Amino acid sequence: MQDKNNIDFENIMRMNEIAEVYELTKQNKKAENYHRNIVKLCDRHPKNETALQYKIHSLNQLNKPYKSLETTNELLNLNPNSLIALFNIIKFLKEASYV
């Protein structure tokens, strides 16, 4: 029997591929729905780097900031594609300071 984490990550990867196809075919509502589901699945594995990368990617696709500052140090150790997420954190902090 496969580990539940492996099953979740296989589902996340498959859902991400499907969302990319929907984005390419301009079916944005369906792509957004898949990205929301990816974020929910990734929330089950908050300390896993791969899940964090997929969550950040999906949040970027949804134009939502990454709000958990607890793992900002983990973000700094991720690949360069996650720099957009760091900019989203900065944007969120700036907006919060003006409130």
PLM region descriptions:
Residues D3-K4, I38-L41, L75:
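Canonical positions in the second alpha-helix
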Residues R14, N48-A51, A85:
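TPR alpha-solenoid repeat register
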Residues F9, D43-P46, P80:
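Short coil turns that delineate tetratricopeptide repeat
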